Amino acid sequence: MLKYFGTDGVRGVANAGLTPEMAFKLGRDGGYVLTKDKKDGERAKVLVSRDTRISGQMLEYALISGLLSVGIEVLEVGVITTPGLSYLVRAQGADAGVQISASHNPVEDNGIKFFGSDGLKLSDAKEEEIEKLIDAPEDKLPRPSAEGLGTVTNYHEGASKYLQFIENTLPEELGGIKVVVDGANGAASALISRLFADMGVDFTTIATHPNGLNINDHVGATHTKKLQEEVVKQGAQLGLAFDGDADRCIAVDENGNEVDGDHIMYVIGSYLADHGRLKKDTIVTTVMSNLGFTKALERRGLKNVRTQVGDRYVSEEMRANGYNLGGEQSGHVIISDYHNTGDGMLTGLHLLYVMKDTGKSLSELLSDFKEYPQRLINVPVKDKKDWKEHKRITEAIKKVEEELSDEGRIFVRPSGTQSLLRVMTEAPTQELADKYCEEVAKVVEEEMGSK
């Protein structure tokens, strides 16, 4: 297991766990690893962007200093979504990109996420290479002077280029359906009105006035209550919520019900399949997707391939086997005909397009999807790495698996960013899901709990 990199880059409390000093080292060491193969005389180019957190500029300046110290030319994009940066890295032919964001996490946190020249997250091997340099007893990387140093160029026009890209993925304007959009006071806040107005959408917004401190503050993809209330209050047909860096989208139907990533993929995937455009009649998800999702697909003659948790692994599976739709229950949805990473705004507009083209409400499009009751318990633990070595835990899991058979499941995994073990169950009834989840969580707490 990696020391600094989690499932989504390096994260921590800004100016405590994730310090400017650490950002400098990540810029210097990460920049070197990603650009060391440039031919002599060729300047490496790296794009840097951030979300709206107050700590973003502090970490950005430190990170950029690290990049400049190994001779890298930096294009400073400013505030933009994570998928926006991913797109611009490819569009600009850059060697790499770095996004400063902690996504859906609270404002105290921040993170640093690297992308390769293909706009994709780094492999475990690349992250391990960076970590070895960070922990090296001596810094032996090049230290150019004068003309060998990098410089910074403002590239704030990148946002307009990214919005144009999204608009070009849709064949027509999207008027006629009333939408409420929640920007989470995050990176999408300044982009939503431009994009949705350009597409002719009848929309209103909430949480699009970031002040550096209010990102994800009871709004956004992980806090949809306010959006649900607004959809009902305004008589809207759809609500769309993004998270802090807008790489995920959660929807709300016309009745105020939350619609997660599984449901969104089902709607878009079914539409693509009906039009002969769902490659291999398959949608790729992680092991966290609801069992009801798989069974709903099977009723339509479609298939579901599952990966370990993390949109990076979904993306890898899609590219390896030629699938064009995948994602996570949490709202990361990859429509690879257009983009190679989860993109909240792209996903939201394509969901809206399906509603417009079919003339159906979101609840109608989901009428065949019967979700299995689910329970998730996060158990704080001392050390999440060796949980499989605890016989009582593995035996408790096996017992539940045998009792549920193919009418439910249990899944235990370590958090990628926190000292937690996540215990998740699905069963035909909520009572059973609660019972089995609580049983296993109790054993985990007794064996490994941090209290």
Curated annotation (Swiss-Prot):
Disulfide bond sites: none
Residues that, per the record, bind Mg(2+): 103, 243, 245, 247
The protein's Enzyme Commission number: 5.4.2.10
Gene Ontology molecular-function annotations: magnesium ion binding; phosphoglucosamine mutase activity; phosphomannomutase activity
Gene3D superfamilies referenced in this protein's UniProt entry, alphabetically: Alpha-D-Glucose-1,6-Bisphosphate, subunit A, domain 3 (3.40.120.10), Alpha-D-phosphohexomutase, C-terminal domain (3.30.310.50)
A Pfam family assignment: PGM_PMM_II
Cofactor or coenzyme needed: Mg(2+)
Modified residues (Phosphoserine): 103
GO biological process: carbohydrate metabolic process; peptidoglycan biosynthetic process; UDP-N-acetylglucosamine biosynthetic process
Cofactor: record remark: Binds 1 Mg(2+) ion per subunit.
Entry comment on modification after translation: Activated by phosphorylation.
Keyword terms, alphabetized: Isomerase, Magnesium, Metal-binding, Phosphoprotein
Reactions listed under catalytic activity: alpha-D-glucosamine 1-phosphate = D-glucosamine 6-phosphate
Known function: Catalyzes the conversion of glucosamine-6-phosphate to glucosamine-1-phosphate.
UniProt family annotation: Belongs to the phosphohexose mutase family.
Alphabetical list of HAMAP family matching this protein: GlmM_B (MF_01554_B)
Protein name: Phosphoglucosamine mutase
